[in-house]
């Protein structure tokens, strides 16, 4: 059974590995369905992550800052003017509106034309909004000029990358595998390498077309020019906001000024009285200075990132991402395709890497590329070999795999002449549990059942007596009865109910087992292990399994069989059954006659040797032997008082033959037998 379970686990593992390898290597119909669904849900990304970061830094962040300034101006008054106390409400509103429009600091003793202006504080939010719109112009030009051509190029590239992998997996790799298998097991590594190199030289027309396409893209630079122009334009346009914001941050520090309202209206008409001056304050100046500083730092940082990216892209970058993996699928990328780094291959490689979720075979291609020490064909060949091995009809032998299944019928202690242990090749089948006629024996917790019975009768504990001479005398009789029953069973019987299979008997008694054995208290004395006599035969069931009083009288001493004679069939009303395997041997419940009969025959060695075997009325043993003292005490309780002998001679005397039937209850399954003296 252990070997069968191991075999089942090995086959399940092999099947699972085969399915995984099949999904890994061969393209299936699920790829086409997934590709069609992905084409509907996913769109090509025509902007790189770096370009999105630049757009956010130069456009979106300034717009957010402008929104913050406008929110503050609308939430509270943009200017505070402290008018004289004799101004009415309308006069105060007029003074505040006039000063917010004028925004000129009326310095005393200075000509009015030379008064400094604070108009930049009012214009700054609108300037930031204009700068954000200007910085979005390069991204908008890239969207209009390069999106159409870039979309067509990417669609062709992504589809061809998938096709290249599929052609290699379906065509070239199986072809190499067949050629290697045709050489036989004696093929060398050099021959394998030659087969792989010859297969690499054989290319399909589609592969040649794709290589020509890559070569042409390596010599053109249209997309490279557009990409470079986009970022250079960003650098040039960013100079304007940086210059303006730097000037504003350096010069516009004043947030309080004096506003000249003109002559007082209360003065005489036509007279030039003193002008009225009002002190004013701009509360948003500090916030605008902070926003200007943040915008300056952000634009400078974006320009630095753009410069580093352009230098890396067109000067120092050597990797082409996805195109570097094409040599694993038979597409040879040549460096002479690129006359310089300033070509479309670099731009297309970045966008293919960004749209790699459209490549259905990308994970398989990455798996092959990670095996840098092996060529693609060697990797696929090994995977296909493992797939074929998992689909084989027999279990891999010792040479095919490191797992072997040794024949369980072979004794490992006996050395065999062969060098290798025998290996059993079993066909691959679905394992099913087949019930047999000889089920495994279940453990029988006898001691636990005895403890439960003893715990249920704690109200009247019985003292434990020592082993008496009567126990010693009964033991040979029990052995003789067991031997007689065994002899009778071996001699054969009728072909009726006695031919019931033992398995059914075991199931039956296991099903009807009960622990309700009142009113006895069972002892936990274990049987001797030196001599194991055969099990006593058991009757069928308790329903009608006891003899009536007339049948008991009809048996008598004359019907008792001798020591060696088999028991007649009429003395056993029911066919016998073997005892349960979990019970101790000879563990029947025997009932003896009470010591009230006046028998004076003394014990002697001669009488002991000629003792007749007992007439057997047995049941399947469910508990160990009842102590004989317990049976005497039970009889004394039924008669109303103890019947102790007057002297030791009465204790050792043998009572006349009398058959007493115990276990008048219905539920428990016990063994009842008679003892004759």
UniProtKB/Swiss-Prot annotation:
It comes from Mus musculus (Mouse). The keyword rRNA-binding does not apply. One of its GO terms (cellular component) is endoplasmic reticulum membrane. It is found in: Cell membrane; Golgi apparatus membrane; Endoplasmic reticulum membrane. Belongs to the pannexin family. This is Pannexin-2. The chain crosses the membrane at residues 54-74, 126-146, 231-251, 296-316. Expression is enriched in central nervous system. Expressed in suprabasal layers of skin epidermis.
């Amino acid at each position: 059974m252990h070997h069968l379970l191991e075999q089942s686990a090995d086959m399940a593992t092999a099947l699972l590995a085969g399915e995984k390898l099949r999904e890994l290597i061969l393209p299936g119909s699920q790829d086409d369905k997934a590709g069609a669904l992905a084409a509907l849900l996913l769109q090509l990304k025509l902007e790189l992550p770096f370009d999105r970061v630049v757009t956010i830094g130069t456009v979106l962040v300034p717009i957010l800052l402008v929104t913050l300034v406008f929110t503050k101006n609308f939430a509270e008054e943009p200017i505070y003017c402290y008018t004289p106390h004799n101004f009415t409400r309308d006069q105060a509103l007029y003074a505040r509106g006039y000063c917010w429009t004028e925004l000129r600091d009326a310095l005393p003793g200075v000509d009015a034309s030379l008064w400094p202006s604070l108009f930049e504080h009012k214009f700054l939010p609108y300037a930031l909004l204009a700068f954000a719109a200007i910085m979005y112009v390069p991204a908008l030009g890239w969207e209009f000029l390069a999106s159409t051509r870039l979309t067509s190029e990417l669609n062709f590239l992504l589809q061809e990358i998938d096709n290249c992998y599929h052609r290699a997996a379906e065509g070239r790799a199986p072809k190499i595998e067949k050629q290697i298998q045709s050489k036989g097991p004696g093929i060398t590594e050099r021959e394998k390498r030659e087969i792989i190199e010859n297969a690499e030289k054989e290319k399909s027309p589609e592969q040649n077309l794709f290589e020509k396409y890559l070569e042409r893209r390596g010599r053109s630079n249209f997309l490279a020019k557009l990409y470079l122009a986009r970022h250079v334009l960003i650098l040039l346009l960013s100079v304007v906001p940086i210059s303006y914001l730097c000037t504003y941050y350096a010069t516009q520090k004043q947030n309080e000024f004096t506003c000249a309202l003109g002559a007082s209206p209360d003065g005489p008409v036509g007279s030039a009285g003193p002008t009225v001056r009002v002190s004013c304050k701009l509360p948003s100046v500090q916030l605008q200075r902070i926003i200007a500083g943040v915008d300056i730092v952000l634009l400078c940082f974006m320009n630095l990132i753009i410069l580093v990216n352009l230098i890396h892209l067109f000067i120092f970058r050597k990797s082409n991402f996805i195109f570097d993996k094409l040599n694993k699928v038979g597409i040879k990328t040549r460096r002479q395709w690129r006359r310089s780094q300033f070509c479309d291959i670099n731009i297309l490689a970045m966008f293919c890497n960004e749209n790699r979720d459209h490549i259905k075979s990308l994970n398989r291609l990455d798996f092959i590329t990670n095996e840098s020490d092996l060529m693609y064909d060697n990797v696929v060949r090994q995977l296909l070999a493992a797939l074929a091995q998992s689909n084989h009809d027999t279990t891999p032998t010792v040479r095919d795999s490191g797992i072997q299944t040794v024949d369980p019928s072979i004794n490992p202690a006996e050395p065999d002449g062969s060098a290798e242990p025998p290996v059993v090749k079993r066909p691959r089948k679905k394992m099913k549990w087949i019930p047999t006629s000889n089920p495994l024996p279940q453990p029988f917790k006898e001691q636990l059942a005895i403890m439960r019975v003893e715990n249920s009768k704690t109200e009247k504990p019985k003292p434990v007596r020592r082993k008496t001479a009567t126990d010693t005398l009964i033991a040979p009789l029990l052995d003789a009865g067991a031997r007689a029953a065994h002899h009778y069973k071996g001699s054969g019987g009728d072909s009726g109910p006695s031919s019931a299979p033992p398995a059914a008997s075991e199931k039956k008694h296991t099903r009807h087992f009960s622990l309700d054995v009142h009113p006895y208290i069972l002892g936990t004395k274990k049987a001797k292990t030196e001599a194991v006599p055969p099990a006593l035969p058991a009757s069928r069931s308790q329903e009608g399994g006891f003899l009536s009083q007339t049948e008991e009288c009809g048996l008598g001493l004359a019907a008792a069989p001798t020591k060696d004679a088999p028991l007649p069939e009429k003395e056993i009303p029911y066919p016998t059954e073997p005892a349960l395997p979990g019970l101790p041997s000879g563990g029947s419940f025997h009932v003896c006659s009470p010591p009230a009969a006046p028998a004076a025959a003394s014990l002697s060695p001669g009488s002991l040797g000629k003792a007749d075997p007992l007439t057997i009325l047995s049941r399947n043993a469910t508990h160990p032997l009842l102590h004989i003292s317990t049976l005497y005490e039970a009889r004394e309780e039924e008669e109303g008082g103890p019947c102790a002998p007057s002297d030791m001679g009465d204790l050792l005397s043998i009572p006349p033959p009398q058959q007493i039937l115990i276990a008048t209850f219905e539920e428990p399954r016990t063994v009842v037998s008679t003892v004759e003296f």
